Amino acid sequence: ARTGAPFDEVLVSLGLVSERILRSLLAREWGLPVLDLATTDRDESFIRQWSGQKLLAQHWMPVRRNPDGSVVVATSRPVTPARRALIAAEVEAAVEFGAVSQWDLRQFALSVFRHEIADEAANALSRRSPLLSAKTVLSRGQVAGFVLLGLVAAGAVALWPVRTAEVLIVAMSLAFLAGTVFRYVVAVRGARFDMVERISDAEVGELRDRDLPRYTVLVPLYQDAHVVSRLVPNLARLDYPPEKLEVLFLVEQEDRATQEAIDAARPPANFRVISIPPGEPQTKPRALNVGLFFATGEHLVIFDAQD
């Protein structure tokens, strides 16, 4: 009640209960059976008829269709009559609910929608705005232009080597100068819009936890096991209600060393590891796109472990 966060999220984020115990408590409170998404049978082709992000936002996910036509549904929120009717209408069948935690549901979504998530993370921008994407490095026209320019330069070097060298040096110097001037102008013009708002300690003290927004901190890691022992304690010192702060470590699936280093560092309960599905390009921006799929904060922060 103090923070306005769901009670189950408060318990887990404070480390008061484990996911397994929470699952049992929720099931007992809601009068539902416990559903272990890690071991229960699933029909992934059936589940993928829906949007994973939409299902996560609504705190439920279909698992499989039973022989009698009913649908097994995992839920991380109580089942009211209105909610039961809404979900039954969505799956167009009678439903059998099982209780899970919200983290269970997110891990289940990552497993079921792994290919879709990986594809969306790598290719969504190129499909939506090709001109803003670097997926295509050079067009055919650009390749032809560079080849032609190279041939002209080679001919000039062969015929007028000294004069060509002088021209190239001047051209590169002018290009460097233009870049420097451009960055300076952008910095000066942008500085006019900088806003600094000073907050006193008294104003901070008057803030109520209930009024604070929820934050997600995305921490992309790749072969960074050597920094984890310092990184985790530093992030754990963030002075913010843990039930309103989620820290997601984004680790490539095959990077076992980094994952083991995080486990060994014993991070707080509101720190989670998202295993990035295999795919190309294997970059931090792609990992961050995967993290966006699971982020639940009103505000989002990116923390680069290398910094």
Question: How would you label these PLM feature ranges?
Answer:
Residues 119-207:
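N-terminal membrane-anchoring/stem segments of glycan-assembly enzymes
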Residues 199-307:
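Internal catalytic domains of large membrane-associated glycosyltransferases
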Residues 2-5, 54-57, 65-69, 89-92, ...:
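Short flexible coil/turn linkers enriched for glycine and charged/polar residues
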Residues 50-53, 109-117, 286-293:
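Short, surface-exposed amphipathic charged segments that create phosphate/polyanion-binding patches used
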Residues 87-125:
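Extended, hydrophilic extramembrane loops/domains of integral membrane proteins
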Residues 1-13:
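N-terminal, charged amphipathic alpha-helical interaction modules
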Residues 13-90:
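Polyanionic, low-complexity intrinsically disordered segments
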